[in-house]
Amino acid sequence: LLVSSENKTKNNKKLQINLALNYGSKTELLNAFKKLKNSKKILNEDNFKNYLQTRDIPDPDILIRTGNTRRLSNFLLWQIAYAEIFFEKKLWPDFNEKDYNRIIKKFKSIKRNFGNI
């Protein structure tokens, strides 16, 4: 299923969807810190981000959490700092295009400030 989906969308350029399988943000952060420490580079956001598993992927603008659970579950803790987070009651298999479009519409109405007041 994943290979088929990847092949069908390999030429798409407008939207990027990432699935994180067997991923844990705490482990990613710890490993990135260890690598940065061993590199002797200055500890700053840019240097740190270069050691994350997701270094070549843009930070998400939207996080959709399905399953009527209001937690992040150790998912992209660094990367979602400025993402808009939507919690959905539906389970992932039941989440459909109508649900997705509703979230996109809501997202477009949000004035994002990226941490500024």
Predicted regions and their residues:
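Flexible, compositionally biased loop and terminal segments
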Residues: L1-I117
